Amino acid sequence: MEYIEGNTGKWEYVIGLEIHAQISSKTKLFSGSSTLFAASPNSQVSYVDAAMPGMLPVLNKHCVHQAIKTGLALKAKINKYSVFDRKNYFYADLPQGYQISQFYYPIVQDGMIEIQTSTGNLKTIRINRLHLEQDAGKSIHDQSPYYSMIDLNRAGIGLMEIVTEPDISSPEEAAEFVKKLRNLLRYIGSCDGDMEKGSLRCDANISVRRSGEALGTRCEIKNINSIRNIIKAIEFEAKRQVDLLESGEAIIQETRLFNVDSCETKTMRLKEEALDYRYFPDPDLLPLVIHDELINELKSSLPELPDQKIEKYTKKFGLSKYDAGIIVSDESIAEYFEKAANECNPKMLTNWLITELFGQLNKASIGISECKITPSDFAKLIKLIENNTISGKIAKTVFEIMFATGKAPDKIVEEKGLVQISDNKILNTVIDEVIAENSKSVKCYKSGKDKLFGFFVGQVMKKTKCKANPTLVNKLLKEKLDS
């Protein structure tokens, strides 16, 4: 449990999240309009999206399938009967005057995600519901000083709203939950999880309380658009509430916005209750009935999920849960790893992926799909180290050439003459030269200055241009110096 340090003692975070995940679909939830990102304004708007009189919504079957798959991945209950409701409110970018959502009977209920806390323990975050709804359009306020513009390209795009219970106890847990959920959605292909493009948006409901007290008054922070900002927004809002309570003021239930420049939350509007939206079943849409056959079919189509991969990597490949978690955090990296791990030492491969490859990818600002090194060639590099053909230090040089050119490691080693020297006769000759050239250091070593041993190893490596087998050098050198 993480606490907020107030002037009068410690306070607990109580956090629930609402995630709006844009469904990966070529067309909108109730019309055939395209969902292509960054198209010219109002170029992807049908009569249904614009709410022209007499136009009726037609439910997109693919979006329903994506919601069911997501529910199954969340270990949730798929409701065989669900209903679309009208959520009534006025806003300029909502042409219908209401949003089609699911309030009373959502498509998915009672799911869960396990996250790892800062102490290394697993914690279950319960998911209250997942429901389908349509997105609103976009208001643009910076094109003119006199009026706002409306772009309805986004209006009607299908969303999955995923609502947690208030089980989250720190900003870091909230960030970890969103990262894990985003990764899960990407694995099953129901949402691309791109927060920069708005494909995944997060609202945080935050309250604070003393340990053992009832839940406090909550405030909702809308549309947080990055993992980092989730942490910053929750930290600021919780501290703001603690300061108010400790000064004797009450918390007003309201909706607030997070300012990314000042890292503060500001009042947007008073928080509405469900009654304010006057929910009622949409008369233009029949109830959604889902049969067991469809659920079973979609369940069998699910790929291996991140938690399943972690379990496999720890059992089959002997990885730590931490390392396995890093590998599965990106589906393309997990796929790359599996292709290479079947051909070499998986633990050594993991170390090289995390310390060397990830560093180069970050430096080049590219993803693993753009990497010139094939999984097979990466496995060859690991095997060259394993069988003592090259040293670890030389391997780093070979790796850098591979990353830049895409050349196979064995060809680089051959062309550059980088094969490791493991011949005792050759190494003994070099060691004899080093000892002869450093007689004073030898006397100091023999008089008890053991730390000089590293100096002699370095001299041997220098003479062999780092091609000497370091294990063999240590063995032969020790024999010579201790004799």
From Swiss-Prot:
EC number: 6.3.5.-
SUPFAM superfamilies: GatB/YqeY motif (SSF89095), Glutamine synthetase/guanido kinase (SSF55931)
Quaternary structure annotation from Swiss-Prot or TrEMBL: Heterotrimer of A, B and C subunits.
Keyword Transit peptide appears in the UniProt entry: no
Keywords per UniProt: ATP-binding, Ligase, Nucleotide-binding, Protein biosynthesis
Cellular component, GO annotation: glutamyl-tRNA(Gln) amidotransferase complex
Protein name (Swiss-Prot/TrEMBL): Aspartyl/glutamyl-tRNA(Asn/Gln) amidotransferase subunit B
